[in-house]
Amino acid sequence: MINTFIKKFPESSSCLKTLKECSFDIDNNVFLTNSPHPAYNYDDIKTKYASNIPCKNDCLSSVDSLLEIDGKLLWIEFKNKNITKSETISIKRKASESLLIFIDVTKFDLKQVHDNSEFILVFNKNKNPALLKREQNKKIVDYQGFNTITDNLAKLSGDHYIHFGLDSLELAHFKRVYTLSSSEFENFCHSHHIATQ
């Protein structure tokens, strides 16, 4: 699917970077992954796309990166900050508008893109104290192994918990949605044969 996008929007071919570069937080001078795996910097693609429409760059938002693994599009947003409700709204907007750009360029229908797309939010666990507190409480309240049992059942069923209210993206936009800490993302990369260092 990415090849179709590049063919129809050749300016985007210059936006190929690494996941590490796409994860860079300029405000804090930090990377959320060290992966050298090639990925398209979708923010750069969005800027090139927006230069062709009247509203220019400020009317669109986008996720940080896009890559294709085993025929699946992986849309990735990196967040090195506390994810508030307003930040969640911003993330949903970025995801939606990223898909709109892709669909406009490729002319694929939404169902086709949905069925071949996964969204990943990679976040800094240390900057999300409510999530850390919930995990600490989970360990304290683990009534006779209840949390361990439910976690194992979720793993067996292929389910996963989606943080920050982003589960609605899985219903409408993407086949799967993941919210992963930086270390969980490294594990995800290993299990999906994405280079990590």
Q: PLM features: residue spans?
A:
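Beta-rich catalytic cores
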Residues: 61
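Conserved catalytic cores of phosphodiester-cleaving nucleases, focusing on short active-site segments
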Residues: 65-67, 71-81, 98
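Short, flexible loop/turn elements at secondary-structure junctions
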Residues: 23, 30, 37, 69, ...
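Catalytic micro-motifs at enzyme active sites that drive phosphoryl/nucleotidyl and oxygen chemistry
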Residues: 53-55, 64, 106-110
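Catalytic cores of nucleic-acid endonucleases
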Residues: 81-135
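Short linear motifs at secondary-structure transitions and domain/linker junctions
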Residues: 40-42, 50-52, 92-100, 154
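Acidic-basic catalytic patches of nuclease active cores, encompassing PD-(D/E)XK
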Residues: 1-58
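Polybasic (Lys/Arg-rich)
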Residues: 11, 137-197
